[in-house]
A protein has these predicted regions:
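A short core secondary-structure module
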Residues: 151, 156-200
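Hydrophobic, small-residue-rich alpha-helical packing segments that form membrane-like cores
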Residues: 135-138, 153
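Intrinsic disorder at enzyme termini
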Residues: 1-15
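A short, Trp-centered hydrophobic/proline-enriched beta-strand micro-motif
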Residues: 122-130, 173-174
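Short Ser/Thr-interspersed hydrophobic loop/turn segments at strand-loop and sheet-helix junctions
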Residues: 58, 81-86, 175, 191-197, ...
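Internal helix-loop-helix
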Residues: 48-123, 164-170
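Glycine-rich beta->alpha junctions and the first turn(s) of the following alpha-helix
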Residues: 3-7, 199-286
């Protein structure tokens, strides 16, 4: 039974356009290491510029509306882009983009222009700040607070196991805004510019590398305009964020490049003078 997916002529023409851009913009010597945490500063800066150029074409987040910096394209176009970037070991994103639909759904027009456009065009990157010491799988158990002070909110608390390769331009996440409120109706969801006075990032020392962080908030003051949704709708906004991941959208990728790299590795890499692929144990378990 044949399960091969066939692209249309229009989609293949788009593939040629993407290939031409990537081949011209990213020569083989610029292909990135497999582990994003291995990117040096120069390589990271290089690919940030590539992302900005892709964002200008609407290719960084191709299925989002053009009016906010997306491409207005289809999921098939996005898969073509993903495949071609994966074949060249080009990092797809440096942001946690799960917040993007939340801004589309819950954001005001001003918030979409201020926060969504720079993220979709690659001008800015962002961190998701959800987990706390008391709230991992139970997000509703968070303790960090946001207290209203005039038109602003003052945030205190901490987050941990926050994924990030470099410093972001924006953070997002829920905080307790109604201390005596009912569960799931006591949170507000904030978009926090970085750097800001009162925010400290600290790398965690873990066996799997430095890609996780502590984030501390000490009397951080944010504008009321940075509240996404109502002051007690943070749980609902967070659910919109996480729905993308629950549906698989947070892990969309093209497996072909990984498979090709694996096949090349077992064919070309030798152990005791014999290709890895010829090892009986490898052949038995493949």
């Amino acid at each position: 039974m044949d399960f091969e997916f066939a692209y249309s002529g229009e989609q293949e023409a788009f593939r040629q356009e993407v290939r031409a851009f990537l081949d011209q913009r990213v020569p083989p010597e610029r292909h990135a290491p497999v582990d994003p945490e291995s990117l040096d500063d120069d390589t990271f800066a290089y690919f940030r510029e590539v992302h900005k150029e892709m964002g200008a074409r609407g290719w960084l987040y191709p299925t989002y509306p053009k009016q906010y910096g997306g491409g207005g394209l289809t999921a098939d176009h996005e898969m073509v882009i993903d495949e071609e970037m994966a074949r060249r070991d080009i990092p797809r994103h440096f942001s946690n983009g799960l917040v993007l639909p939340s801004i589309l759904v819950w954001g005001t027009e001003e918030q979409k222009k201020q926060f969504l456009v720079p993220l979709l065009t690659g001008q800015q990157t962002c961190y998701q700040t959800f987990s706390e010491s008391s709230a991992g799988s139970d997000l509703a158990a968070i303790k960090s607070t946001a207290v209203r002070d005039g038109d602003d909110w003052v945030i205190n608390g901490h987050k941990l196991f926050i994924t990030g390769i470099r410093e972001p331009d924006l953070m997002y996440g829920p905080f307790v805004t109604v201390p005596d409120g009912a569960r799931h109706h006591n949170l507000g969801y904030f978009l926090i510019p970085y750097p800001s006075p009162g925010v400290t990032l600290e790398r965690m020392t873990l066996l799997n590398g430095p890609g996780q962080l502590f984030i501390y908030f000490d009397n951080l003051r944010v504008r009321g305009a940075n509240l996404l949704g109502g002051h007690d709708e943070g749980w609902q906004v967070a659910a919109t964020t996480l729905e993308q991941e629950h549906g698989g959208r947070g892990a969309a990728f093209s497996p072909d490049a990984d498979l090709h790299q694996l096949l090349a590795y077992i064919r070309e890499t030798k152990r005791r003078g014999v290709p890895v692929g010829a090892d009986p144990t490898v052949r038995l378990t493949a």
